[in-house]
Amino acid sequence: MNIILFYFMPILISLPGLLASGTYPNDVYGLTYDCGKLGENEHCLKICKIHGVEYGYCYGWRCWCDKLSDKNKLFWDVYKEHC
C-alpha cells in the first residue's frame, strides 16, 4: 500500500497546477489591474490580450487572465517581446 502511495504522490501534488492555470497580470508598476464589473468584461479582455492570452475576466475586483504564464505576467516582459 505504501508503494502505491509513493508512486501516486507526485501526480497528486501536480494536479492543482494543471487545474488552475492563470494568474493576475501586473501593470507597469507591478500592481494588478483593477476592474469594476465582476465577471467577463471588455476591460479585462483587453488587458489579457495585451499580455498575450485570449480570455480573461474580473475576479475579486481584479482582472484574471486564464492560461497566463509567469513569463508574460509583468507588463514590461510583454513589452520587451513586442519591440
Swiss-Prot record:
Pfam families registered for this protein in UniProt: Toxin_3 (PF00537)
A single MF term (Gene Ontology): sodium channel inhibitor activity
Matches recorded under InterPro entries: LCN-type_CS_alpha_beta_dom, Scorpion_toxin-like_sf, Scorpion_toxinL/defensin
Disulfide bonds: 35-58, 44-63, 48-65
Cellular localization per UniProt: Secreted
Domain LCN-type CS-alpha/beta: 22-83
Entry keyword set: Disulfide bond, G-protein coupled receptor impairing toxin, Ion channel impairing toxin, Neurotoxin, Potassium channel impairing toxin, Secreted, Signal, Toxin, Voltage-gated potassium channel impairing toxin, Voltage-gated sodium channel impairing toxin
Entry GO terms, CC: extracellular region
Highest taxon of the lineage: Eukaryota
Primary residence: secreted
Tissue specificity annotation: Expressed by the venom gland.
UniProt signal peptide: 1-21
Protein family (similarity comment): Belongs to the long (3 C-C) scorpion toxin superfamily.
Record's function text: The heterodimer non-edited LVP1 induces lipolysis in rat adipocytes. Induction of lipolysis by LVP1 appears to be mediated through the beta-2 adrenergic receptor pathway (ADRB2). The edited BmKBTx-like, similar to beta-toxins, may modulate voltage-gated sodium channels (Nav) and may block voltage-gated potassium channels (Kv).
Subunit organization: Monomer (edited version) and heterodimer (non-edited version) of this alpha chain and a beta chain (AC P0CI43).
Domain note: Has the structural arrangement of an alpha-helix connected to antiparallel beta-sheets by disulfide bonds (CS-alpha/beta).
Protein name: Lipolysis-activating peptide 1-alpha chain
